[in-house]
UniProtKB/Swiss-Prot annotation:
Family listed: Belongs to the glycosyltransferase 4 family. MraY subfamily.
Organism lineage string: Bacteria, Pseudomonadati, Campylobacterota, Epsilonproteobacteria, Campylobacterales
InterPro entries xrefs: Glycosyl_transferase_4 (IPR000715), PNAcMuramoyl-5peptid_Trfase (IPR003524), PNAcMuramoyl-5peptid_Trfase_CS (IPR018480)
Cofactor list: Mg(2+)
Location of this chain's protein in the cell: Cell inner membrane
UniProt-recorded name of the protein: Phospho-N-acetylmuramoyl-pentapeptide-transferase
Keywords assigned by UniProt, alphabetized: Cell cycle, Cell division, Cell inner membrane, Cell membrane, Cell shape, Cell wall biogenesis/degradation, Magnesium, Membrane, Metal-binding, Peptidoglycan synthesis, Transferase, Transmembrane, Transmembrane helix
Signal sequence, renumbered to the chain: none
Length: 353
């Protein structure tokens, strides 16, 4: 779409905001159109989500719900992005690569579970970690060696970099990518629970990307100046549109689950956005719901191994609330509210620095 301006001699399609808008609606329409067809196909192929044997009783009725919906909304976002971005932008190409690679990892994991009808038959934890590290390196190393990405570490509400991580930045960035990817994966346990917080996180990071990529805005707001970063906003918009199309079918009661192909890709992409916008630490606030879910699992496993006692009735924490009697809809909406508030607070750091 950017290159249409060369043919028409109008600058309309050179604006990031215009192309982001087109990407959003293209992805939304694709997702809304393709998802019901995928649901029908998945039901015919019995490609449903295996339910964890110790899951709350209310989850037993979900055993026939199709999974791998992430493949559709990620594909929709990629197609929309490719139709709108500039192909000579290393940030945009790396971002798309991140989205695709982490989706493929999740897809392999999903297929293992679906084909064997066993929730433990996907990728082993060790293999999943290894593939995530490799995918992370493929996305990060070109940026590092091209000197396009600063290795300085920034903290929220402070305008100057804390210090330069130098070569250690690679290990730190891989940690951020993997942690974010798995955190969203852990959160995806209730209908729409991971979808809406992901939309909030993508929106917040998209704003940071746009401001840091604009030299005037970044200088005025004392944000890191990173030329070319704004192009990734188009991919953010496409993914938000695709997620909204997916949410139409994923809201309670869900007609389709995103599966690991969706959750791992979303988490990896959100982590990547935090890295290139220099918001690695602020990601703890931007993705607060994902952090909360992950910490609950760490506490549960650690407490059981050390003290042989459980902190929660079940982890991740959304299952704990199910066990104490909260209905699923109440948990979902309250977690959405927490995600919204945490992202608004993260946005406040733009001016308060």
């Amino acid at each position: 779409m950017y290159y249409l301006s060369d043919l028409s001699h109008y600058a309309f399609f050179t604006y990031i905001s215009v192309r982001a808008g087109f990407a959003f609606f293209i992805a939304l329409c694709l997702s809304l159109f393709l998802m019901p067809k995928f649901i029908t196909w998945a039901k015919n192929k019995n490609a449903s989500q295996p339910i964890y044997e110790y899951a709350p009783e209310t989850h037993k009725t979900k055993c026939h719900t199709p999974t791998m919906g992430g493949l559709i909304f990620i594909s929709s976002a990629v197609i929309a992005s490719l139709s709108c971005i500039k192909f000579d932008n290393i940030f945009a190409i790396s971002a798309l690569l991140c989205l695709i690679l982490f989706c493929l990892i999740g897809l392999i994991d999903d297929l293992g579970k679906v084909l064997k009808k066993d929730n433990h038959s996907g990728l082993s934890p060790r293999m999943k970690l290894l593939t995530q590290i490799i995918a992370g390196l493929i996305c990060i190393l070109p940026l590092y060696f091209s000197s396009e990405l600063s290795t300085e570490l920034f903290i929220p509400f402070y305008k100057h970099p804390l210090f330069d991580m130098e070569i250690f930045a690679i290990a730190f960035w891989i940690l951020v990518l993997i942690s974010s990817s798995n955190a969203v994966n852990l959160t995806d346990g209730l209908d729409g629970l991971a979808t809406v917080p992901s939309i909030f996180s993508l929106s917040t990071l998209g704003i940071f990307l746009y401001l840091s990529g604009n030299l005037n805005y970044s200088e005025y707001l004392l944000l890191p100046k990173i030329q070319g970063l704004g192009e990734v906003v188009i991919i953010c918009a496409a993914l938000i549109g695709a997620l909204m199309g997916f949410l139409w079918y994923n809201c309670y009661p869900a007609q389709v689950f995103m599966g690991d192909s969706g959750s791992l890709a979303l988490g990896g992409f959100i982590g990547f956005l935090a890295i290139i916008s220099k918001n690695e630490i602020l990601l703890l606030l931007i993705g607060f719901v994902f952090v909360l879910e992950t910490v609950s699992v760490i506490l549960q496993v650690g407490s059981f191994k050390i003290f042989n006692k459980r902190v929660f009735k079940m982890a991740p924490i959304h299952h704990h609330f199910e066990k104490v009697g909260w209905v699923e809809n109440k948990i979902i909406v309250r977690f959405w509210m927490i995600a919204l508030l945490s992202n608004l607070l993260a946005l406040a750091s733009i001016k308060l620095r």
